[in-house]
Amino acid sequence: MTDLTAEQIAQNYSAMGDSVALINDVIAGNAMADDDAADRQDCVDRNTQHLELMVAKDYWTDESMTAANAAITAGNGYTAS
């Protein structure tokens, strides 16, 4: 893999924040409330998988993964109804 620039790493971290927000909002009922359960579940599952992949990257330095790890835990425990 090509080494990432600091800007690319920052963009990846920002994208992780977007996934965290979406997972939390779907679970709280603040996003996708009008979508069916299967679509909400798929959204949470995809974003949780994205976070799991990104947290495992070896290029992070002092970025906090607390919110990402919490969203992963919440996403893995989520069952849409």
Where in the sequence are the language-model features?
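Beta-rich interaction/scaffold domains
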Residues: 1-81
